[in-house]
């Protein structure tokens, strides 16, 4: 599973790493758009608004998680490049600890952030209640993906999200169509498919030899490790979070203008999110390749990575 990014053609390494990541990001975007599209095919405007508002909150949480995971990817990659698997194990364990703390602190404030039209309140509450059950699985998926990417493997996370995306579409059609569960069906499809992606990811870790041996000691908070993860991951999370805050402000304004405006804005925001696929892919690629090369004492290759990207 581990891929050495410190030798060979830098340009080839960028393409090999970036393309699977780009496809993964596209599938994640498709994941959210599928909920809205299928809901729109079988339900009314109130259900579309409920799913749009609920998914906006979930996307905000996901952006925070993915941003922090970037810090983990860099620290793991640096440790792998230096051949120090003990530091990589500490980074993985402390990432799990950090994510759990962030989720506990962030969920309630985000839920109370947006004002939902009265007609869509029941559906939004139902959607979020079920999706919150899936938050640990979102976290687990991103932690496992950051481990794979830190080891230089961006293909495995792509396979994990592809399985989840296919399952989500199939379950959405079943739950929202024949079973007529509306927003509840969309949330169930999302949560169950996220659970499946984590199961597949755990199987991937078990099947491949990573050279990592995690123990309880690795999960103990270490100030130095957490500091390095946050130093890199927090600015990324804040940067992407600010973009999502802008979207949420637009959502709040649309919510106060009525049901139809709220639904329309929710759909457009899903389309706009697709525009961030390429820059986000390049950010992840530069982070993974540079961290391994800096860890291996090859700053010139890290500089070449930035130049080519």
Regions found by a protein language model. Name each.
Residues 12-73, 77, 234-254:
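Signature of the first transmembrane helix
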Residues 7, 165-199:
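Membrane-interface helix-loop junctions in multi-pass transport and translocation proteins
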Residues 1-16, 190, 202-243:
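Interhelical loop/hinge segments that connect adjacent transmembrane helices in multipass membrane
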Residues 103-105, 118-141, 279:
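Alpha-helical transmembrane segments of multi-pass membrane proteins
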Residues 30-49, 111-118, 174-181, 241-274, ...:
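Helix-terminus/linker motif at the lipid-water interface of multi-pass membrane proteins
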Residues 21, 29, 56-59, 94, ...:
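Residue-level recognition of pore/gate-forming positions within transmembrane alpha-helices
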Residues 48-102, 138-157, 265-309:
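Small-residue-rich hydrophobic transmembrane alpha-helices
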Residues 33, 37, 64, 98, ...:
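Membrane-embedded alpha-helical segments of multi-pass transporters/permeases
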